[in-house]
């Protein structure tokens, strides 16, 4: 009964993923559908990509839906970068496609064509910007509704698969540019690591990400158990007992509490959790303002966290 919505751009990674899913569909009982997003950015090249994907899907007899967006216009309207706007519209496209499938949410999977080097690039990018454990294991083979069927494959293996199966694909010219940070990591930094440090750097980083993911999952579970003791009046009241927990559990619990109250994760950072922890050492009556209309205040017995 499951439906797999495959995000296909027409590039080498997504074409290998689509071919693998098409082959698996013969053995496993699921419905395969393709989602292609036209971002309205690259003019005739984007039109070419759309036609290519539509033609392949007709040839392989896979239903395909194209969603068109004016990303430059939306980027100006939303006051966001085009990269962030692109992520938002792609997420919306999958949501729109899922809505017309007539299935329960639990029966729908979204397949993304991230590969082993993508994972390594993301780790490096997040590490250089500053991150916690979560930012070092953001790409997982299966993560809720998201699946990444080719995360275990290197770009060399993907190239071999394309050649062996005689699968055509297209090249996105923006991937060749060094304008974006991720492309500079891809073209220069990761190859240098593999040439001058370890030839299997990307593979080893993928293995490390898997171990970090296990640690992240355990810490999240433990902090969730701790957090449940301090829920009160549509917020949280952290007494002395909370502040005797290991500090990493305190941080993870505060992270979950604030995400729950805010209803989102974006713009919540380590500095906010640290401020709440510091508040416990301050005098009664002190308070701090937090994103999304949240507030933490110190009273006689602890720290209260709630929405204003």
Region locations from a protein language model:
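AMP-forming adenylation/ATP pyrophosphatase catalytic core
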Residues: 1-13, 31-37, 69, 89, ...
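Conserved phosphate/pyrophosphate-binding and hydrolysis machinery centered on Walker-type P-loop NTPases
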Residues: 113, 117, 174-183, 201-205, ...
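Core alpha/beta nucleotide-donor-binding catalytic domains of modification enzymes
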Residues: 1-188
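Inter-helical turn/loop segments and adjacent helix faces that build the functional surface
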Residues: 192-204
